[in-house]
């Protein structure tokens, strides 16, 4: 969904599953909704705000570059096939396969019936089903993977392909990762943690992961790292015996940051944390301070400036 120019930590679990599938011999293809992104997946309560075509195109190019660099996946844009479909062809070739009662029975649609849902959002399901059909026919895609909130859209695609071609295809969903309170995992103080290091520094990622809840860290090691079962069990033992050392937390931060940005960025984040928490401020460069606190939070003052002047 190209609503931003970078992926965030909330996306990471599904991408890592696709990475595991790739290592097992499969060929993952990331679909970016350059077409559907201009409409928006129905939300449980309100309609999503539209974003401009120019912004969608910019976001697509940024996401494509990021995914190719980090994960090595092929990236496609569904606007490439939607731009050639007119409304008559859409209704004749695809709409006829969708029963309105079937669509109304989808959970996300049912929850919006009382408050109202536009036809734009209502038709989103058909477009996602069409995506699966196109990729199946043109790219040989037989399995669609997504978060569990996309189950209804995936099954719509499976049904469309079966009805129109007789082919059997499959869906694979994964639960959304949450913290111990059931809140979506991957935000710090309400803000997204971006995978683009110019938007979220490696230091901020490090601080986030070394401070995850003790009760959840082993589960996160299983989801977000490629450590072996035996290695994770060893970290679990260490965490139980000496939780104050936070070895499992540090391993989580190390594995994720090294995977995303490389060993050098991880070591830099550890070094910055050491300087900050051991009061070694004199050794920090201006760029180090900007990474620690964000350049927008840094102000230059003169030696004789008072607090009143600053305020």
Residue map of PLM features:
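Conserved nucleotide- and phosphate/pyrophosphate-binding catalytic cores
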Residues: 163-311
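NTP-dependent nucleotidyl-transfer catalytic core
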Residues: 1-150, 154-158, 164-170, 183
């Amino acid at each position: 969904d190209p609503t931003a120019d970078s992926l965030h930590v909330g996306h990471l679990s599904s991408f890592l599953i696709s990475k595991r599938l790739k290592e097992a011999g499969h060929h993952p293809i990331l679909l970016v909704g350059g077409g559907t992104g201009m409409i928006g997946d129905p939300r449980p309560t309100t309609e999503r705000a539209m974003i401009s075509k120019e912004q969608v195109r910019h976001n697509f190019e940024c996401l494509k570059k990021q995914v190719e660099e980090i994960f090595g996946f092929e990236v496609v844009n569904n606007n490439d096939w939607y731009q050639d479909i007119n409304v008559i062809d859409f209704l004749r070739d695809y709409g006829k396969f969708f029963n309105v009662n079937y669509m109304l029975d989808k959970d996300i649609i049912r929850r919006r019936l009382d408050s109202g849902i536009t036809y734009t959002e209502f038709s989103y399901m058909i477009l996602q089903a069409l995506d699966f059909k196109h990729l199946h026919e043109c790219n040989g895609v037989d399995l669609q993977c997504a978060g569990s909130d996309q189950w209804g859209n995936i099954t719509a695609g499976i049904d469309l392909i079966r009805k129109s071609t007789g082919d059997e295809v499959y869906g694979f969903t994964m639960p959304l990762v949450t913290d111990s309170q059931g809140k979506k995992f991957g935000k710090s103080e309400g803000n997204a943690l971006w995978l683009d290091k110019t938007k979220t520094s490696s230091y901020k990622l490090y601080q986030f992961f070394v401070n995850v809840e003790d009760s959840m860290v082993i589960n996160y090691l299983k989801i977000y790292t490629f450590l072996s079962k035996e290695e994770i069990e060893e970290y679990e033992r260490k965490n139980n015996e000496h939780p104050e050392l936070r070895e499992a937390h540090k391993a989580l931060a190390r594995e994720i940051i090294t995977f995303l940005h490389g060993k050098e960025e991880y070591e830099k984040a550890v070094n910055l944390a050491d300087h900050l928490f051991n009061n070694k401020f004199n050794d920090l460069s201006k760029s180090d301070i900007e990474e620690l606190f964000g350049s927008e939070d840094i102000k230059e003052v003169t030696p004789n400036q008072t607090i009143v002047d600053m305020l």
